[in-house]
Amino acid sequence: MSLRERATVITGMGAVASIGVGLDAFWSAIAAGRTGVRGALRFATEAYDVHLGASLDPAALPAGLLDGDAAIDPSAAVAILAAREAMERAGITGATIAADRLAIVMGTSAGGLCSRSAYELTDPRERAQRHRVLERSGFHVQTAAVADALGIDGPRLTVSTACASSTHALGHARDLLRRGLADAVITGGVDLLIEETFAGFHAMGAISPAPCAPFSLPVGMSVGEGAGFLVLERLDDAERRSRQPLAALLGVGSSADGHHPTAPDPTGLGIARALRAALDDAGVTPAQIGYFNAHGTGTEANDLAEWRALQRVFGADAERLPVSSLKGHLGHTLGAAGVLEIIATILAMQRGLLPPTLGFTTSRGHGPPDLIAGAIPREARVRFALKSSSAFGGANAAVVLAGDARDAVAITAIERPAAVVILGASAVAAHGFEGLDAALRRGIPLWRSVDASGSPVPLPPVAARVPPIPLARLVRGVDPRGMDTLTRFLTTAAALALADAGLVIRGTLRERVGLVAGAARLPWDSADAFWDSIRARGYARLSAPAFSRIVMNAAAGAAARSLSLLGPTSLLAGGPLGGLHAVAVAAEMLACRDDADALVAGAADELGPGMLADHAFMHPDAGREDDPFPIYAADHEAPVRGEGAACFVLARAASASMLAPTKAPIARVAGTGLAGPRGLDVAIGFALRAAEISPADVDAIYGSADGTLASSRAELDALHAVFGASLARIPLANPASILGASEGLSALTTAAAIEALRTGRAHPIAGAASCPGLELHGASRGPVRTVLIIAADPAAGSAALLLQAP
């Protein structure tokens, strides 16, 4: 790939914020020094001792936008408004870029929380209503709503690393472009100011009684809301469309603190690693940075850690570096914070200005000396800017921007992405934590009867639950007390994958190994504790510890802390595709970036009481103990729910022997493919082309259909389109017939496929339904050396992964 093809530029932007709706109003407020922090919130604040927040002005929005409707959560409605502006300003229409070549990568910390709260606070006996709002609450469903509204039919990724979400999203969006999976990516983030988030930060004592004053007094944050989106394109494509780039995205970096669930590492080491990674990725030195846009929440912990990180990266030059935070204007917009502040930075750079730190009056004595104090932007022309974001769970992200797109061409080219291998794998499911291959070959379903005594609503007759896992015995030094179920599953799976790889995490290697996780929903244990505290004591006295655990990346952050994984981190809220999304994204990060030597990738899913009740509502007669349910059946469905986790250790092939000298790779990542919900065949085609093989070279296919007619048909239609008549000669496997159909099934499917590569044999489908033209019994024509893993979902899109024996 040429230098110009790799260069990533920004061709459109859109903003919805408390200071203004649309770029013009947004910048006018910044230029005039107006804050969006005010007292007009959409909920009563009499029970609190703080009454301020940066809420959207209803008069500036389309009528009824924040009310939502039966199909769309209010957060999605706000995101659509910002994303539409970005696309319009980029000149993107169906006539300029094909819908299936448009991708979306959206970040959110609490997307869908309005709907999840409605679910939690609705009488359990209102089963139909609860099902509707639970289905609408998925984070990936918000991304789907934006994509559907704007005609985006390419890959869809949802990133949820709390307040770093939209900054992480930019990095994943760039990787999609570099691998040719899209011609343009709409990327950004959204979050709304609802009482749950306001009350949560209030319970933590984090909110200032006056408008936020980063690095100044009073100490504390102001909660905000909004959405921001960018259009990313390759420079060549933008020029071909005669679009003038607004800026260039030069470098991205991320890291994990491994310190605390909510507080940043006070030494600034974690933030510094992300900053250095972004600078290295950009090929820019600290001395070339002319402006730093800080996360700058206004809390003592964040502001001090960020300043110490700057001192570590910039040395003595940190004293002279212009620094500002936009939180005084916008409040803390959570998952939208990074992208809205990037938009403000680009708008300022275009005008030869730097945005100020609104509200700064008095230094706390330990912060950047040059905080661009005052209300009016400063005149200054800078070539490069650096942006930082930090979050609950210890997640950090950073990006380097250039005001002139010509600077993007100076990046050192990777002529061919690095080869990636898998060093270790694990699975935690109804079979336990070992013996997956044997359990799948026995062919006996692992679900058992569900005890419905005491439940106010019907529960399904059977489910495939994970048996007790001795985490403290399996992972030395890890205390499972205080961990919720999802965290225990993910931590166990990640630890077992590292052990299978023979990888010992210690010394400087801790900073070079990271975690990319997938998840379908908030952790049920912690969510129950959070809303139970609201029901028992009211919003103003809710549980602060439970609030800190209802961010989607809480389990990933806890696993990273427990296992000392301090390298790049991300959380893909991909619903049923979370596992495959995590593996595909991790493979792209290793292939295209240089800030990690290895990544643990995988996903976890749990069967909370609410999921069991919802499944019983949708499939009241599904499953009997020891009786398999039909997968890929043509005319009936009776799926059984399961749960579990699976993780994999990915590394560059060139460094695998140095990382794990006693273990050989167990698989090679030959190709990945991502596409929209109607494009599973397209995703498979991407993977085949990346692997440089034909359909005839595939020895086995592992599907992730959950037993519903729709999911089965989506996989079968795509397979017939790609393989044609030859499909009858290729065994099709699916572990749901033994382990149950969990929302994290695509990760468990990948683990099963790796076992097929280890043994050379595909697995049978228990009680295989009669499907003419398909080889469902697992018999192979010969040793399984190449396996295709697939998954598709109407909201999350489609994914394909090709693995080969090493």
Where are these regions (language model features)?
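Short loop-beta-helix segment that forms the pyridoxal 5′-phosphate
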Residues: 155-161, 568-573
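Active-site histidine-anchored catalytic micro-motif
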Residues: 169
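Conserved "HGTGT" condensation-loop signature of ketosynthase/thiolase-family condensing enzymes
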Residues: 1-155, 175, 194, 200-222, ...
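Short glycine/serine-rich loop segments
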Residues: 173-193, 590
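Glycine-rich, Trp-frequent "lid" loop and neighboring beta-strands that shape
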Residues: 163, 572-576, 595
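Short, well-structured beta-strand segments enriched in hydrophobic/aromatic residues
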Residues: 184-188, 598-604
